[in-house]
Swiss-Prot record:
WD repeat ranges, renumbered to this chain: 4-46, 52-93, 94-135, 137-180, 181-221, 222-263, 264-312
Entry GO CC: ribonucleoprotein complex; ribosome
Protein name: Small ribosomal subunit protein RACK1
Regions crossing the membrane: none
Amino acid sequence: MTEQMTLRGTLQGHGGWVTQIATTPQYPDMILSASRDKSLIVWRLTRDESSYGVPQKSLHGHGHFVSDVILSSDGQFALSGSWDHTLRLWDLSTGQTTRRFVGHTKDVLSVAFSADNRQIVSGSRDKTIKLWNTLGVCKYTIQDDCHTDWTSCVRFSPNTQNPIIVSSGWDRLVKVWNLTNCKLKTNHYGHTGYVNTVTVSPDGSLCASGGKDSQAMLWDLNEGKHLYTLDGAGDTINALCFSPNRYWLCVASGPSIKIWDLEGKVVVDELKPEVMGTTSKAPTCLSLAWSADGQTLFAGYTDKLIRVWQVSMVSR
């Protein structure tokens, strides 16, 4: 028996590119998505044949594209970042904004919560990284040793024994920051084009980065060194996502999602949207999120859809 992915359905509701998707173990029947239509949608997963889920709430307030969204660990709150230069904290029970985070001077491209949900980090086209508390107060702005071009992505490590932030930038660098003093710990060199995205493994030991050079690079966060590179994306990498319970890394580039088994460094499966007709161009995959149980992969695209794949066993 071997594992492969099967397309289960789509989620339709956004009026623009689906830029990010968030899931939570607390609510397995809910996901949250962000879009260039300036809104966020809370979805209730019905898993029906006709539609995999229905929009339950739309969150409105941002004045420009919503670039990123993350859920608090209890699933009660969402944090979003937007090209309107702000972050917003949302109470999902009411659908209202509880805090606006003002301070960035350009588009906010990325937001993240620390493991304990007490700290928030954001990255922006103003090239800075800001640390905030949940009251919306900016506690620190990282400017020394920061990216010399747009800060494209920021992520906390889930490992509380090693409190770090990882960031990527259009200056081709992946940077690791010591959270205790906000000082630079490591510069990771290797990418030959801008870096779009970075993601940290569930145990905090690894991080993966990708962008223009279509190489997924893996870095050891404990040792601060380059481990290996997964080649063959062929297109700009827009999203990366570790499986929560398998040694897999999903790499989205162009219309394709490659699922790499990191043990054997082999592609387990490649997922592509079905395209009607020969003239239509396949949509680009921009965002990826696994369900907490690692059985379902959600992917957001430039055709405004979220596609849903499920892990299934097949006999060889």
